[in-house]
């Protein structure tokens, strides 16, 4: 079985697609913000999905998204640039200030999204974006112990201070090195992890992880 992270580029999107991301991220530094989310943070998020698949972990899909966001946040707190994390957190907070909260009064976050998971109601930029951005900020707020997160995912955790730091520029071109360093760090802990490749797509709306035979 092989694993692949497919990630679209902002710069190859249509004018309409780019305009949509400008509306989401703002007109200033849209390219950087897109890359910060999708080619820095989200590479580790999608890696989390691959790792759960490798470990044959089958959990509720909403819980899986929450777990891989906790994994990505925890990873970057140990292996990332703290300035990037601050920029990332600030960016998410700014976006959520303008994205309407769709959760009905009296319903919990996870309860609501479990009720609409897999439906057309979820498949809008505003709805799914609210879910993902909110769950990332929730992971930042909870600040779970990274070793506990790895254990929950069925992975070994070694000396966190020995992790290799990633400090390259945030660009689409560096997405492969983001993944390479993360795999190196996880293998350093004694985890046997299959190779994972990155495939770039012209469509910036395509962001996912696939496993194939």
What does each model-identified segment do?
Residues 51-54, 79, 197:
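Structural signature of transmembrane alpha-helix termini at the membrane-water interface
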Residues 103-213:
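Pan-zinc metallopeptidase signature
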Residues 47, 51, 75-76, 116, ...:
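Generic structural signal for hydrophobic core residues of well-folded globular domains
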Residues 62-96:
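Post-HExxH zinc-binding segment in Zn-dependent metallohydrolases
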């Amino acid at each position: 079985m092989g694993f692949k992270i497919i990630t679209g580029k902002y710069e190859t999107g249509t004018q309409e697609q780019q305009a949509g991301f400008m509306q989401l991220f703002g007109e200033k530094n849209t390219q950087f913000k897109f890359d910060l989310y999708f080619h820095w943070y989200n590479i580790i998020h999608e890696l989390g999905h691959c790792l759960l698949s490798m470990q044959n972990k089958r959990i509720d899909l909403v819980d899986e998204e929450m777990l891989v966001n906790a994994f990505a946040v925890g990873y970057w707190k140990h292996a990332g640039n703290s300035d990037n994390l601050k920029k990332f957190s600030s960016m998410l907070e700014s976006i959520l200030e303008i994205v309407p909260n769709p959760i009905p009064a009296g319903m919990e976050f996870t309860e609501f999204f479990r009720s609409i998971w897999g439906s057309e109601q979820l498949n809008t930029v505003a709805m799914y974006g609210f879910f993902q951005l909110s769950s990332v900020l929730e992971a930042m707020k909870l600040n779970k112990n990274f070793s506990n997160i790895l254990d929950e995912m069925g992975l070994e955790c070694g000396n966190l201070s020995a992790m290799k730091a990633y400090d390259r520029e945030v660009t689409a071109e560096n997405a492969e090195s983001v993944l390479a360093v993360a795999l190196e760090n996880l293998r350093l802990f004694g985890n046997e992890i299959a190779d994972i490749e990155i495939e770039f797509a012209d469509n910036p709306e395509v962001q996912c992880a696939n496993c194939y035979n």
